[in-house]
A protein has these predicted regions:
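N-terminal glycine-rich phosphate-binding loop for ADP-containing cofactors
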Residues: 1-4, 15, 27-29, 67-72, ...
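Amphipathic alpha-helical interaction surfaces in cytosolic regulatory modules
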Residues: 53-66
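Gly/Ser-rich catalytic serine loop of serine hydrolases
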Residues: 93-99
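Conserved CoA-thioester-binding segment of acyl-CoA-metabolizing enzymes
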Residues: 1-51, 71, 75-78
């Protein structure tokens, strides 16, 4: 982090390459500086910008479970908001997650025309942890806040200006513009504009209509965290700000411990750590394209799923029942394309376990053959290539969700019916560990 005082303006530049992530070290440094600034009488405004091409890209997903380590991002944001002088955030590049929450804590927000802002935590099963659910509705109302929070879609600078999320778009360099604006605020003795004290968005007569609409449209959404977001945005209009922050923190902790979020974060890491020979991106569409080795893995996984579905049908399960279970589990469609039927809880459990057992069993054999080094690589391929539901993190993790020891015992009973349920040696090995298949790493030939 870089810091200096110029003509009464404390100039803070976040410097944590390559994207100014809010690491624990940066939070400690920023926390200490904010404590000092609160006591200085020679500082009349504060400018916060980022080094390089982006303001701040938030927190590394792999460090989310350490986000509450002191000083927490929530504490940092509260200290920024409570400073006795105007604080201006100068935004550029793709501002993500904690970077957006940092900006919301400032009293003013400026952005370059090419800047985009996004809060994509919902896609990871997480609630935004540092005040976004309480500050954002105060600025833009419930409808816009929920759209930003639930969709995770980037908001352009122009859209942000129209909604009230930012105060202005600059045409020159953001650092110079932010400093100039700070000097303007000092000259005109402009008052503080703490978002916590704003009520414009909360006074929207359609605020609670937006809440009700969001509940209606997400009632069948598989991501459980979306209900927590809606509750938190509703709380913003019903509770004092500080109590609202406590409400948000409780839901943040709930989302952090949710197995669905754990699965989604694991998958996020797996997708970003796939070996280069397994996945590339199409130059034009930017879509992920599986390489030859990943395609070989995919063919084997698909084959095991097909055999399991066909075997269950041959043994008397209806096509509609099998498809209903697959769709309810999260697949876009069933194997047979049949009309889904009502399925008893007992039958639902068995169909699910037979499907996951077959696919994960083949995954174990893929590990044995050295075609993949890690179970997470197999899971990423399954999600990318065969539409395996993201919130289950792939078949190898899904086996752990069911219980590998339990699933292995079931497969030992089923393997007489078809080799697709043969228990692989790697499943015996995975059953020894709490982390299941994730505890196993093999050398690829």
């Amino acid at each position: 982090m870089k810091f200096r005082v110029r003509d009464g303006v404390a100039v803070i530049v976040l410097a944590s390459p390559p994207v100014n992530a809010l690491t624990h070290a940066l939070r400690v440094e920023l926390d200490h500086l904010l404590d000092q600034l609160a006591l200085r009488d020679d500082v009349m405004a504060v400018s916060i910008t980022g080094e390089g091409d982006t303001f701040c890209a938030g927190v590394d997903v792999r460090q989310m479970d350490k986000l509450d380590d002191a000083p927490s991002l929530r504490t940092i944001c509260q200290k920024i908001e409570n400073l006795p002088v105007p604080v201006i955030a100068g935004l550029r590049g793709m501002v993500l997650s904690g970077g957006v929450e940092l900006a919301l804590a400032a009293h003013y927000r400026l952005a370059e025309a090419s800047c985009k802002l996004a809060l994509p935590e919902a896609s990871l099963g997480l609630l935004s942890p540092a005040g976004a659910t309480q500050r954002l509705p105060r600025l833009v109302g419930a409808a816009s806040a929920l759209d930003i929070l639930l969709s995770g879609r980037p908001v352009t600078a122009e859209q942000a200006k129209l909604s009230g999320l930012i105060d202005g778009i600059v045409t020159g360099g953001i650092r110079a513009a932010t400093l100039q604006f700070a000097e303007h605020l000092i000259t005109h003795k402009s008052p503080l504009r703490r978002v916590r004290d704003m009520t414009k968005g909360l006074r929207d007569p359609k605020y609670f209509d937006a809440i009700a609409k969001a509940r209606k449209t997400t009632e069948r959404d598989p991501l459980r965290v979306k209900a927590l977001y809606i509750d938190a945005v509703e709380a913003a209009a019903m509770l004092p700000f500080d109590i609202g922050l406590e409400f948000e923190e409780e839901r943040w902790q709930q989302s952090l411990a949710d197995p669905q979020s754990i699965a989604l974060r694991r998958l996020f890491a797996a997708e970003h750590q796939l070996p280069a020979d397994m996945v590339t991106r199409d130059a034009e569409t930017r879509r992920r394209v599986l390489g030859p080795k990943a395609q070989d893995i995919l063919k084997r996984l698909r084959r095991s799923q097909v055999i399991a579905a066909e075997m269950m049908f041959a043994m008397g399960r209806s096509k509609g029942a099998i498809d209903a279970v697959m769709i309810d589990y999260g697949f876009a469609q069933g194997h047979f394309g049949a009309e889904p039927e009502q399925v008893s809880p007992q039958d639902r459990t068995e169909i699910t376990e037979r499907l996951i057992g077959a696919i994960a069993g083949e995954g174990g054999r893929i590990l044995q053959d050295g075609l993949a080094r890690r179970a997470a690589d197999i899971d990423a391929v399954a999600v990318i290539g065969m539409g395996f539901p993201r919130w289950h993190s792939g078949p190898m993790h899904a086996a752990r969700e069911i219980g590998i020891v339990h699933l292995r015992e079931k497969m030992r009973d089923w393997q007489v019916e078809s080799p697709v349920w043969t228990v692989p040696r790697m499943m015996d090995e995975a059953a020894k560990y709490l982390m299941g298949f994730d505890a196993i790493s093999v050398q690829r030939p």
